[in-house]
């Protein structure tokens, strides 16, 4: 499984529609609109690098209003849930 974080610049008047279209794409797990340097952040989870190579330029970049994407590939996931699981070994709930 490959997780990628895709930063997306979108024409201002098309952000809601673009966000929904991107969210509906297979492999896109979450889409956030945000303040800052980019308009949308998409969290993607796909089978392999070939799939992310298809998803971003082949689908996300072609959504009407999308101007630019920057993709970051995740190496490892660190989350509170992982920490909680690690420290609860042998403890009863």
Give the positions of each predicted feature.
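A compositional/biophysical signature of low hydrophobicity enriched in polar/charged and small residues
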Residues: 1-93
């Amino acid at each position: 499984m490959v997780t990628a974080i895709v930063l997306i610049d979108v024409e201002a008047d098309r952000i809601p529609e673009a966000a929904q279209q991107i969210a509906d794409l297979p492999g896109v797990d979450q889409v956030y609109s945000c303040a800052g340097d980019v308009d949308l952040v998409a969290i993607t989870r796909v089978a392999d690098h070939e799939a992310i190579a298809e998803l971003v330029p082949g689908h996300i970049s072609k959504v009407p209003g999308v101007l630019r994407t920057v993709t970051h590939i995740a190496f490892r996931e660190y989350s509170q849930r992982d920490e909680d699981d690690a420290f609860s070994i042998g403890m009863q709930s």
